[in-house]
Amino acid sequence: MSKKYDKLGNDVFNKVEKINSELFTLTYGALVTQLIKDYEDIEQVNIKLEQMGYNIGIRLIEEFLAKSGIGRCSDFIETAEVIAKVGFKMFLGVNAHVGDWDANRKEFHLTIEDNPLIDFVELPDQYKHKLYYSNILCGVMRGALEMVQMKVKCTFVKCTLSDDSTSEIKVVLEEVLSDMIPVGYD
């Protein structure tokens, strides 16, 4: 299954329109810097980045589904592989790796070896292990998965900007949402 999604991720990445990665990275850095100035409390910056990502994710899922041609995943394991091999490749140009599944297959860790959001970035010591610079990614995944009926909680557990060897996000499936149409919307 993983090889299939590796190929699909590469195929979709080669077809989508791209922007200059340095411009993207520097623009994101300016956004984070402005949030730090606006909020002063680093935890509020983390929350705001996650909320911004959520708003992006609920819209990005439509583009993802349209351009990738992927239908409904059979289970959470397949969903994790699609996120790692197709989603991250399509939108960030990198692959992520899925691992550390719990016994119930409701929780996994997503490892990003080469996070493009942190190029050219060095965190001051007072922000290490406090500011989750790429927290927008957690929000994007939460928003996108909610649109396909999965309520998840995403949290950064490791960040290379805080001297960890990799960037790692913990994803927990909290609930599969009902896809019943609300009364009066038929």
From Swiss-Prot:
Statement: the UniProt record of this protein carries the keyword Endoplasmic reticulum: yes
GO biological process: endoplasmic reticulum to Golgi vesicle-mediated transport; intra-Golgi vesicle-mediated transport
CDD domains: TRAPPC3_bet3 (cd14942)
Main function: May play a role in vesicular transport from endoplasmic reticulum to Golgi.
InterPro entries reported for this sequence: Bet3, NO_sig/Golgi_transp_ligand-bd, TRAPP_component
Similarity annotation: Belongs to the TRAPP small subunits family. BET3 subfamily.
Name assigned to this protein: Trafficking protein particle complex subunit 3
Subunit note: Homodimer. Part of the multisubunit TRAPP (transport protein particle) complex.
Lineage, highest ranks first: Eukaryota, Amoebozoa, Evosea, Eumycetozoa, Dictyostelia
One Pfam family cited in the UniProt record for this chain: TRAPP
Cell compartment(s), UniProt: Golgi apparatus, cis-Golgi network; Endoplasmic reticulum
GO cellular component, one term: TRAPP complex
UniProt key word Endoplasmic reticulum: yes
Keywords: Endoplasmic reticulum, ER-Golgi transport, Golgi apparatus, Transport
